[in-house]
Design a protein with these regions (language model features):
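Short Cys/His-rich "knuckle" micro-motifs
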Residues: 70, 116-122, 138-142, 180-187, ...
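Short cysteine-rich clusters marking metal-coordination/redox-active sites
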Residues: 108-112, 128-131, 173-176, 205-208
Length: 289
């Protein structure tokens, strides 16, 4: 069943739930409790509110969406943990203050030159030092960057991007977990996450409205048929960065209409695998060549 997008008015109500410092402190104390249930009196003492009536009002404003109440007291709901988790994701430092310098991120698939990685404005940007190509620009929260040494940044970013793209291809929004629809976009001139491909895939969340564009090569990477082919031909995606895989950045794509079909051919040495997808990006056929 289709999910209606959350109206802006409802978002204002949700933001209002955590707009008071007492409510924020309640969430923080329950987070620190490590899923332990805290009684009303214990929670009020930890938050530091003397007026029990006023404190009960704030708890009521957070329940049941963000807090779960039972006979023993209060715990965070899944949504409550997500609110705190979102704060943690960006709390290590302002994204503009994270300076990891230029980090070696492997070889350029076009010229073989060194790929440099920098973190700017919440994105990991990879450019080739040799030919000057923009290899990829991938979003990453500050916690991903701040929690790892600079030398580990390329590996972490590659794994993080695989995780995010896998969620999308399995039908979950990367922001709110709502259902997403996948739509192919042919011959677009919009800048993709990687080099502009012949075929983009647009993922649209039916709940929050978030839109993500991936090239079709990244989408096909999550098909088990392609993973098996790569394994058989000696390509282990755990030992390389995604942007080093030429077929991901510059997929070999042919498109036909009525009905819509897109064929993506992945070649490794003398072996090739042709994958055919429909207008929902579901795999409808594959062939070794």
């Amino acid at each position: 069943m289709p999910t209606d997008r959350v109206p802006a008015a409802d978002l204002k109500d949700l933001f209002g739930q955590v707009s008071h410092e007492v409510r924020i402190q309640v969430l923080a104390e329950l987070w620190d409790a490590d899923e332990q249930t805290l009684s009303f009196s214990t929670l009020r003492e930890r938050v530091g509110v003397r007026d029990s009536g006023n404190f009960n009002y704030h708890l009521g404003s957070l329940t049941p969406e963000l807090l779960r109440r039972d006979k023993n007291g209060y715990t965070l709901t899944y949504a409550g943990r997500q609110v705190v988790g979102a704060a943690v994701a960006g709390s290590y430092t302002d994204a503009t203050e994270l300076d990891v310098g230029n980090v070696d991120a492997g070889a350029c698939p076009s010229c073989g030159g060194r790929v440099d990685t920098v973190y700017e404005d919440g994105d990991v940007v990879m450019d080739c030092r040799g030919c000057g190509d923009l290899i990829a620009r991938l979003p990453a929260p500050p916690v991903v960057i701040a929690a790892h040494d600079a030398d580990a940044l390329p590996r972490v970013v590659s794994d993080h991007f695989q995780t995010q793209s896998a969620r999308l291809t399995r039908g979950f929004c990367k922001l709110c977990d709502g259902p997403v629809t996948a739509t192919p976009t042919v011959a677009t001139d919009r800048d993709a996450l990687t080099n502009p491909p012949e075929l983009d895939v647009t993922f649209t969340c039916q709940a929050c409205g978030d839109i993500t564009h991936l090239n079709v090569g990244v989408v096909t990477l999550h098909f088990p048929e392609l993973r098996a082919f790569l394994h058989e031909t000696g390509v282990d995606i755990r030992d390389c960065y995604l942007w080093e895989l030429d077929f991901l950045l510059k997929p070999n794509v042919s498109v036909s209409e009525d009905p819509f079909r897109a064929e993506i051919v992945v070649t490794v040495d003398d072996e090739a695998l042709a994958l055919t997808v429909d207008d929902s990006l579901a795999l409808v056929g594959y062939e070794r060549r």
